[in-house]
Amino acid sequence: MGRFNRESFIIQDKDVLRDDYQPKTLEERDEELDEYATALRPVIQGWQPNNVFLYGVTGVGKTAATHDLLEELQESAEEYDDVDLNVIELNCTGCTTSYQVAVNLVNEIRSPSHPLTTVSSTREPMSETGYQQKRIFNELYNDLESIGGTILVVLDEIDNIGSDDDILYELPRARSQLDLNAKIGVVGISNDFKFRENLSPKVKDTLCEEEILFPPYDANELQNILQQRADIAFYNDALETDVVPLCAAFSAQDSGSARQALRLLRKAADIAENEAMTDGAAKVTDEHVREAEHQIQRQQVVEGMHSLTRQGQYVLLTVCQLAAEIETPERTKLIYERYQKVVHNHGSEPLKRRRVHDHLSDLSLHGILRLVDSSSGRGNYNEYELDVSLSSALDALESELGELDNIRETAKRYRVLE
């Protein structure tokens, strides 16, 4: 039998396990959906829409809830002659300034590319460079006024713009400041909890009229979400009973993200399917889930290490040594002391402490280390620990630094590894 054939022993419809699959109902978000619907209700009354700010980690249903509710809102609006609702949707990935957001909004209006966007224009798209910000904002306001009625501007992943938040202040105020007839409301969606805290006070006053937190899913909620998908995705009796609970538990302990849980279940199914093609076994087991978790974490470390210098690898190796001895989370000062010994043992010269701190921050941003805020009688300080399994980190490091059996033996002695 060739490598490519349609024979499947376990997976009936893999697309059901993908992020972009849309179930008939959004599970485990009834409270948030009710709160969100209340915030959007002025639109149906023909009133000025609220500005709504959604926040929560990635994969907890913010964008899916927005799509579901706005599609329902658009259908309801069609029943009323005095409600003319249009939606403009923009994913702000790659937009690091208010200027870029404004240009992309203009071009979304003139050449819509997102599912929710309902407007179109015969005007030519604008170049992303070469204009003053005021000119771009005026072009945007003119386009919005030409659309008229009620306009909801959805800015997904708005935290990408960082501190350059002019657009979030100006856009909600455009109607009152420029005497526009169009009723404009902004829906901002952020994956970064700190983004809201760092907004300027004037932006908070305008954008955050209605705030809705989407908390991480707990293990029971993730189990229900996964089971709903699994019932469709797999053949009968293709999953052992502890597979879905284990996927949910792993993901709940980490991020509480349904996206992460689905990825884990999908990977476990792939591993089991590959085995089934050779030995005929036709079930996903807890061992497949554990192997999938290990492979995903290892790949996460490998991808993060692509941006690391050799010194960055030594910093990670240092934290691995400490983790093997159950000495983490550990303070930056003590990590640096151990790092100096690690570097000398590899025949190199250590960096200054400031640069090592930068490497620790980079590893934290890549999800390889976790920053732990701690305090004592002398004030606050930072501690770091692994945010992936020690085994995954060592596997990835060995591909760059060679055999690390001594650390594995230490970890076994301390019962960190089996």
Please provide the spans of the model-predicted regions:
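Hydrophobic residues on short alpha-helical segments
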Residues: G312-C320, Y336, H357
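Short, hydrophobic-biased segments on the C-terminal half of alpha helices
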Residues: L70, L168, H357-S361
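Terminal-proximal interaction/regulatory segments of ATP-powered molecular machines
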Residues: P329-E418
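Conserved catalytic segments around the Walker B and adjacent sensor/switch elements
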Residues: F53, S76-G94
